[in-house]
Amino acid sequence: MNKIHIFSSPRSGTHYLESLINRMLDISIVPTPFEERNAFNIDTKELSNKINEFNSIDSRVCKTHPNWLFPYDTSVEQFKYLREPDSDMLPLIRQFTEENDYTLGVIRLNIVDVTLSFALAYHNFRLTGDGTGSFRPPYNNNTVTISMEDFVENCNKILAIYEVMIAQKEIKCDKIIYYEDLTFDSSDAKLIGLNTVRTIESSVKQAKSKKETIANYDELREYAIKFFSVHQWSMKITDGVITDMDLSNLKRRK
């Protein structure tokens, strides 16, 4: 496996997994042309050229999230009920995926924890404007208060991302794992399907508990549990944790 793609729900350990694969296989971590929605600010011809350049790399590990590939512009509702990307994006997604040797799907079942983590990361991102202390280490561990208005939008966005992840049919995964099964040490190499396993020191740098860094944590968590028990159709969610979901569109047929 020389070209590995991680397709993941948000806040699900992709930074760690990229680092693990990088150290196990000695292949570079390379951002895709879709990184952080940059792709939606350039025309399709330029994006196609960037994808061709990316695909020419001999070996690499990369990651994407559903909202990078399947844009929703400014309307969460438009994204929530979208069943496939717009016609301009479809060929570009296929152009990207056809060169991957191996695609790993990663899903975090505790969707409430995902939403709280995403809300905190996005809140800190907007405070700094440069990404510091937001979506990647080093984390900003200052205690903040997140407005309920912003959090409601975050809940809608996370639900939309999960729904599109399992509804889309363009990304097929050779293996699907759950964030909750990761041990964050060398043994995860076997879990994600690597044949090469080395004993390496964990690169994980834990952030402080969300209960400590979000001043109104209890209020937000209570809202999220109620939200996800009502506002969803494609998954069974109990106390904020997904207990059943249809992954047939994600699985690659052997």
Segments the model singles out, each with a brief description of its role:
Residues K3, R136-K169, L182-K254:
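PAPS-dependent sulfotransferases, especially Golgi type II membrane carbohydrate sulfotransferases
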